[in-house]
Amino acid sequence: MFDSSKIQPYIAFTDLREWIREAESLGEVKTVLGASWQEEIGLATDVVVPPDDGPAVIFDEVPGSPKGFRLLINCFAGKRRAMTLGFPQGLTKQELSDAYFTHYQKDPKHIPPVIVDDGPVFENVLTGDAVDIMKFPTPIWHANDGGRYIGTGCYSVTMDPDEKWINAGCYRAMIQDEKSVSLLMVPGKHGYMHREKYFKRGEKMPLALVIGGDPLFFFMAGTEQPYGLCEYDIVGGMRKKPVECVRGKITGLPFPANSEIVFEGYLNNNNRKFEGPFGEWTGYYASDESAQPVLEIEAIYHRKDPIILGVPPIGGGSDEMARYRAIMRSAMLKQQLQSAGVPDVTQVWSHEIGASRMLIALAIKQRYAGHAKQVGVLAASCGASVYGCKMVIVVDDDIDVSNLDQLMWAMLSRYDPATSVDILRRMRSTPADPRLTPEQRKVRDFTNSRMVIDATRPYEWRDQFPKVNAPSQEIVRKARDMFGYLLK
């Protein structure tokens, strides 16, 4: 039986360059020279990102950008998943999530950042006429995108004007011109909440946009953290030491001193430009272009030979965004269910196939009648899972919930369509949901319905349910240890 408490996590990198060296030591980094931003980088991304074990790829010598200005894609796949999270190689994705839960989620030790005077990000400081973001290698990721999205693996640093806490959140950024990008912030997200406070006062919002940096910051910024908790504190706790931050010379906002590229300026409600469309995580161009506030960039900071972190959604299946969110969101949901007092939830998996949002599977050790429905309804509503969910499936603990074949088999053989399904209505959805009606979009009604499926053996006669003819998960693991070499 896997025991995640016996693992001693160690994150061996502190910035993107050290991350690349670690990934290179695993033999999982390739370099492409001369690919065009207009089409070829996007095509290469479509090839390498969907496979579960595709390599990380660095693009250099991109026409239109100085040599040495690089772009990295596909950081979270293959052996790089365990390496990025500080865990040993050889763990399954469910075991990675269990280890993440045990060491980073169950009882987190947050460590606030420290402010330092200088850092590598200030190797180049550009202001005034020198501000020109067009020199950075920024591709058209999808053929019908409305522009060049420099911010896909980025995060926006903002401060609550009242409570003064710092948030780092992921919001896509499209280039408008040499000195500005438009940012799409979705209602309910923490950056949006900060933005609205400034705008209601008639003020611009100070913002630092980190375009290239340590993948851990992007991962933490891209998952649903508690309101008021700074993502820097989370990463500091994971590393067991504080993050070193510098303050921007324009806004005073803190950002990691070893960031690759940072744009600093003010988000202006009175300067809106059309943003989008963009091929989003649902696999669709689900929303048209819309007028969004522009970040007026007053300073660019970047290291020598800077590296953009690119994490574009592929959609229609699994991509690196779905892979990292599956591990982290599953652990977060498990912790939230435990905090709600729900007993014996043995496994949680937020499936990649729905961008780790739409399909959630849970295994339980049944304790009482109604246990499965309790778990399913709560899982459909928790903070880690409520956004964009469409389906929750609850199964018995003999099923590997991260295995779609096992999950579908359990559902088809153990649930009854007439009696095992509950529909929840007016739940929180997302503007990226392609199933929102035109009428909903007109009034910004971003809600959906979702299905809770009880695919457990019926509690009242579970002992009479036919026995399965397959070995237990423990026996399967033993068999793989003994005979896995036959598959190599």
Ranges and model annotations:
Residues 1-294, 298-488:
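Extended, highly charged
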